Regions:
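Short, charged/polar surface micro-motifs in flexible loops or helix N-caps
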Residues: 16-22, 30-31, 52, 82-86, ...
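A structural signal for short, well-ordered beta-strand segments
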Residues: 13, 79, 99-101
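Nudix hydrolase/Nudix homology domain
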Residues: 42-44, 107-170
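A generic structural micro-feature
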Residues: 5-7, 38-43, 92-97, 118-123
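The catalytic Nudix box helix
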Residues: 46-80
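Active-site-adjacent beta-strand/loop module that shapes the phosphate/pyrophosphate-binding cleft
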Residues: 84-114, 127, 152
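N-terminal strand-loop-strand
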Residues: 2-46, 58
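Residues that scaffold the ATP/ADP-binding catalytic core of kinase and kinase-like folds
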Residues: 25, 54, 134-137
């Protein structure tokens, strides 16, 4: 029997620019990949990271945005989704307890100079996605169901409680 994965509480942001595009970060998966599916080497994820001792999800989200995209004092909006369970795409697999908050930026200018040093997986880049691009993409975007949440948020339909999402391989 294998040891249980370490529990990690995580805050992430659905970061939107004024054109309603969503910011995602491309990572290289470090787990073994099926040679017949080289496209699985890359996956896209929202900015964010683990909570530090005594930190709230909102404070962690704000800190991570500063570290990863150079945005200080971002206004953290509503909690719109959660995703819980084993996640194995990062170098350190974890039993993730993720919370996703809406963040609207006044421009699309970000500074990713420190992004690579804050991550344990190779960072391949960042991209602003329109809703149409997100919905049509064949690329691996985590978690499953993210596009539906983005659609609701952009329509002004903030859920009364967080929507439950799941990992693609869960």
């Amino acid at each position: 029997m294998s040891d249980p994965l370490p529990l990690r509480h995580i805050a992430r942001a659905l970061v939107f620019d004024p054109a309603d595009r969503l910011l995602l970060i491309a990572y290289e998966a470090v787990r073994p990949i099926d040679p017949a599916k080289p496209e699985e080497r890359c996956f896209w994820f929202m900015p964010g990271g683990g909570l530090e001792e005594g930190e709230t999800h909102e404070a962690a989200c704000r800190r991570e945005l500063s570290e990863e995209i150079g945005v200080d004092d971002a206004p953290i909006g509503p909690l719109v989704a959660t995703c819980n369970g084993p996640f194995r795409l990062f170098r350190k697999p974890r039993d993730a307890r993720e919370r996703y908050f809406v963040v609207r930026l006044p421009s699309d200018r970000i500074d990713t100079a420190r992004l690579a040093e804050t991550e344990d997986n190779p960072v391949l880049g960042t991209r602003w996605w329109t809703l149409a691009e997100l919905e049509a993409s064949a690329e691996r975007i985590e978690p499953a169901g993210l596009a539906a949440v983005v659609r609701r948020v952009l329509a002004g339909d903030i859920p009364p409680g967080p929507v439950t999402l799941s990992w693609r391989d869960a």
